[in-house]
Amino acid sequence: TQIETQARTSFYRKWMPHVHVDYHEQGINSPYYFAPAAEPLHKVITPWQRKCQEHIGGFNATAFDIRGALYFTREIFDLFYPSYGDTWPMFHGAIGMTYEQGGSSRAGRSILTEIGDTLTLAYRIENHHATAIATISAAVHHKDQLLKEFSAYHRRNSEEPWGDYSAYLIPAEGNDEGKMVWLTEMLDKHGITYTTPRSAHKSVPALDYSTLLPTTVKPLKGDLLIDSRQPHSAILGVLFDPDPVLSDSLTYDITTWALPFAYGLKCYGLTSTTKSGGKFAYTIEKDEKKIESPYAWIVDYKTDEGTTILSQLMKTGDLVRVADTPFKSGGIEFDRGTLVITKRNNETLLDEIDEILDLADIEIAGLRVTRVNSGLSESGPDLGSEHFHFLKAPRVAVISGENVSSLSFGEVWHKFEQIYEYPVSVVKGMKRIDLDNYDVVVMPRGWYSLNETQMSELSSWVSEGGQLIAIGGACRSFADKEGWGLSRTGDEEDEMLREDEYDAHSKSDRFAPFALDTRMSVMDDIPGAVYKIGLDNTHPLAYGYGDSYLSIKT
C-alpha cells in the first residue's frame, strides 16, 4: 500500500541485483549487526544463500576486527517474514541482508551511550562504509558462484515450483470481486502472472485455506488461477504459504501472512497441474437497459469499495439509506446493508448522483449499481419502508500523539484518507478533544491514561449516541470498568480454565533455567495467527459479509 515501497519494488525489479543490503540504524547502545541472519529462515532460502551470507559476514568481520569495532551476527534479525529489505530480495534469488548500526535520529551528531562512550555520526558512517566495501569485496571474490546460483534459482522458478502447490485457485463464486482485483494489482506489482482456468474442468485435489485440510475443487472459467511455474515462483510460494514452518520460536515479526488471509479471500492450493483458459479479467454484466430517470439507485454493498462510494455520496450531500432487511427489487435479491438513494429527498443532486454511480458502475469491480423505476419491492420491504435507515455523514476524529502507536494511527488514517477518501480530524491526545464536535472517535492502539473526568465525559457522550472505537491496547482503558461492558475475562468456567493454565505455566516458569527467560516470556505470544470469526451479519457492523470471516492477528 505504501507508495514509497511500490516505487522501491518497481526499481528493484528493473535491476534484479545479486546482492542487496538494507542499511538501518537501531538503538544507540547496540553494537553493529551484519549477516549471517538468525533463525528462523524460511524454507525457500537455499543452502547457497545461507552459505553466501556466511562468506560476506566473514569479510565484514575482518574489516571490523582490524579496527577493533564491536559487532554481532546470528541474533535478533531473522529471514522469515517477506516484507523486509533482506527477505524480499532473498525470495528473488539475491543475497539479501540487513545491516544495523546503533544510532537512529536520536543520536544526532553525537550521543553518550549507557557505558559512557561517545557515539558520533562520523563513526556510524565509518562503520556503514566499512561493511559496504567489505560486502562488495566478498561479492567480487565469489562472483562466479553468485552468477551460477542466481541463474539456477531463476531457472528453477519456471521448472520446479518452490512452494508446496502446483497452482493457487481463487474462485469467483463466494469471493469479493473488488478484493480479487486488489490481489491481481498486488501480483502485477510483483511481476507474478495469472490466468483463468479452462471451462468444464473436473474436480482436482487441493488444500482448502479456510480449514487447512485436503479437499477437492472444480476450477471454473472466471476463477483466478496462479500457476507456480513462472519467473517469480519463489516469492509467489512465500506470499501464498498458508502455514510457514518455524525452525525457531523466537522471531522478529509475524509468522502468518498468506495473501488470501490478508485479503479475506477463499483460496485453494492445487496439488496437480490445471490448464489455463486464457487471460483473467473480471467482468460483470451491466444493465444494458439503463433507466434514465430512476425512482432509486440501489448499490449492492458487498465490497470495500462500497464504503468509498458511500463516502463520495455523503461528501456531495446526498441522502443515502441502508436496508436492515433483505429485499428483492428489479428482479434482483439484495441483502442487508444494501445502499438505497431515492430521487425523493435528493432532487437537487440527481446529476451528481448519476455521475458518481455511473463511473463507479464502470470502473469498480464487484460493485453493482441497479436503477429501479418503482419503490414497490417484489419481496421484502418497499423502498419507502422504515427498514431503510437514513445514514448521517459522521464527523470523525482520530487520536494521535506520543502514546499512540504510529503504525496503528497510520493504518486508520490511510484507510480513511486513501481508501475511503473521507475527511477526518486528527486530534493530539484525548485531553484536547471536544467531544461535542464529533460523532465518532477512533482510538488507535496505544497507551492511554484517562482520568475519572475524561471517563465520565466519554461515557456521557456514548450514552447520547457518540461512537467510540478503541483498537488493541486502547481497550485496556475500558476493560473491567463499570458501564463499559468490556471484560478481561470470560465466564466463570472460562476463568477457571484460564487459572488452571496459568498455574501450569507458573510451575514450568518457576523451574525453568534462567537462560530460557526470553523464550519463556514469549511463550504465550501469538505474533501471527489466522482466526475464523463467526459473524452476526444481521448486525450493521457485519453488513456485506457472510456468516464467518478469516482474520490475521499480528
Task: Report the location of each language-model feature.
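Mobile, glycine- and charge-enriched loop segments
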Residues: T1-Q2
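Intrinsic-disorder/low-complexity accessory segments
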Residues: A7, F11, W15-M16, N29, ...
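Histidine-centered divalent metal-coordination motifs
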Residues: D22-Q26
